[in-house]
Design a protein with these regions (language model features):
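C-terminal substrate-recognition "lid" of short-chain dehydrogenase/reductases
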Residues: 2, 214-243, 248
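Conserved glycine-rich cofactor-binding loop
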Residues: 14-16
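Conserved glycine-rich Rossmann-like NAD(P)H-binding loop of the short-chain dehydrogenase/reductase
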Residues: 28-44
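Substrate-binding pocket helix/loop in short-chain dehydrogenase/reductase
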Residues: 98-99, 103-111, 206
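Active-site helix of classical SDR
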Residues: 122, 160, 168
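Alpha-helical segment proximal to the catalytic Tyr-Lys
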Residues: 127, 173-177, 234
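Residue(s) in the substrate-gating loop at a strand-loop-helix junction
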Residues: 144
């Protein structure tokens, strides 16, 4: 078990990539706090999986876009856990549209939920991590291939994910000497609820453009997160790990 005796906080844990990360962590011996906006359909299954692996799963609730609310909930979870060895900032939304038509509220919502929440949650958790003794801790931030290369119709999303990449690199330089690793994962075209709404012909075009000729699965991202959360990656920090089927090649 790669994460035996570790405690992890995962945001956006109720579905898709977040749920897959929680599952991978539980299977590898971590006790996990999953943060989502409301009680999820996955809760019972995740609690069962945790029990089968001799660990615990705790589902907690907050709107990550509400600074006061998410701060209160994360601080309470941290008090319960004592410390988090791993933080995965995965929660995110899209509000797509051409830039010249985009409403300011759509820009603000995406930046607040996708980027500002990463700062707020990491600030709380990293402050505790740097006081940990004789062990390394890991912060894993979910970026996107769009944050590296841009995408028309997603200027707000691209800005938020590009911001996550820059933030991760800067924070890695701040906390590395205290044993805290900070990395970002940049998924490509992954089969999730977020991509399921795309038209079939658009999805086919995306897949055809990939060297691997297939869409990724949430488990592909979860495997990368598992590696970064484990002691297999203790000399990796400030990096962006592309999990994109070759999209960024």
């Amino acid at each position: 078990m790669l994460l035996k005796n570790k405690k992890a906080l995962v945001t956006g844990s109720s579905r898709g990539i977040g749920k897959a990360i929680v599952e991978a962590f539980l299977k590898n011996g971590a006790e996990v706090w999953g943060l989502c906006s409301k009680p999820s359909a996955a809760k019972d299954d995740l609690e069962k999986l945790a029990s089968e692996n001799g660990v615990a799963f705790h589902e907690i609730y907050a709107d990550v876009g509400n600074a006061e609310q998410v701060t209160e909930v994360v601080k309470a979870a941290l008090a319960e856990a004592g410390t988090f060895d791993v933080l995965v900032n995965n929660a995110g939304i899209t509000r797509d549209g051409l830039s010249f038509r985009m409403k300011k509220e759509d820009w603000d919502d995406v930046l607040r939920i996708n980027l500002t929440s990463v700062f707020l949650i990491s600030q709380i958790v990293s402050g505790n991590m740097i006081r940990a003794k004789d062990k390394s801790c890991s912060i894993i931030n979910m970026a996107s291939i769009v944050g590296l290369h841009g995408q028309g119709g997603q200027v707000n999303y691209a800005a938020s994910k590009g911001g996550i990449i820059a933030y991760s690199k800067a924070l890695a330089k701040e906390v590395g000497s205290r044993g805290v690793l900070v990395n970002a994962i940049a998924p490509g075209f992954i089969e999730t609820d977020m991509t399921a709404v795309l038209k079939d012909d658009m999805k086919a075009q995306w897949v055809e453009s990939l060297p691997l000729k297939r869409a990724g699965k949430p488990e592909d991202i979860a495997n990368a997160a598992l590696f970064l959360a484990s002691d297999l990656s203790t000399y990796i920090t400030g990096q962006v790990i592309g999990v994109d089927g070759g999209m960024g090649a």
